[in-house]
């Protein structure tokens, strides 16, 4: 298991046979900056060579609020295209990971953070989890595959409502609509049980 460097935008540790990748930032909001996206791609490429069940999680109040808008608006057109490709590369690395991947989500899961959660094979969330994609309200639309993945999970009409109207939804509606697999008081512990069970059955 590759160690996370000091000051890295995430930590990586093991609980038994399960790897836990925890997004970290000083403000706890876990923005998906270009540097963070590249670091996540690198670590996923490393652990794919000897895959074990993986949980991706964040802080108590934020899974991730998505891209850093200040960084986004400063991008040139070529740089924006490159960032879009990097985001797609990250989501594909998660979706194609050869062992079970579960997002353990507390609090806000927004924008690119929602894209990341959608790329995971399973999603277990706290009762206070909130989901949304506010890009359309800011004149932006995700280029990271979230539109397609969300449509497959909850249907085109509901996905359009979330993306075009920038509508936020809570944990219970997310469960009823099929966006998430389970609501739990302790998403991390529930995720540990789930990926262990799925890995045993694989």
What are these regions (language model features)?
Residues 56, 68, 116-117, 174:
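Hydrophobic/aromatic residues within transmembrane alpha-helices
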Residues 124-129, 171, 176-202:
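C-terminal long alpha-helix characteristic of the crotonase
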């Amino acid at each position: 298991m590759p160690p996370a460097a000091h000051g890295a935008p995430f930590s990586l540790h093991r609980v038994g046979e399960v790897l836990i990748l925890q997004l970290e930032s000083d403000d706890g909001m876990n923005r998906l900056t270009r540097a963070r996206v590249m670091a996540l791609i690198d670590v996923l490429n490393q652990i794919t060579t000897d895959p074990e069940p993986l949980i991706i999680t964040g802080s108590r109040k934020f899974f991730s609020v998505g891209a850093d808008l200040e960084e986004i608006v400063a991008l040139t057109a070529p740089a924006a295209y490159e960032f879009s490709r990097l985001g797609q590369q990250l989501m594909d690395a998660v979706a194609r990971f050869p062992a079970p991947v579960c997002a353990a989500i507390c609090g806000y899961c927004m924008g690119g953070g929602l894209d990341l959660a959608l790329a995971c094979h399973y999603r277990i969330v706290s009762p206070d989890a909130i989901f949304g994609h506010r890009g359309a309200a800011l004149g932006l639309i995700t280029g990271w595959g979230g539109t397609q993945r969300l449509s497959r999970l909850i249907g085109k009409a509901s996905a359009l409502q979330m993306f075009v109207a920038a509508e936020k939804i809570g944990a219970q509606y997310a469960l009823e609509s099929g966006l998430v697999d389970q609501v739990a008081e302790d998403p991390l512990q529930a995720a540990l049980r789930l990926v262990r069970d799925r890995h045993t059955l694989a």
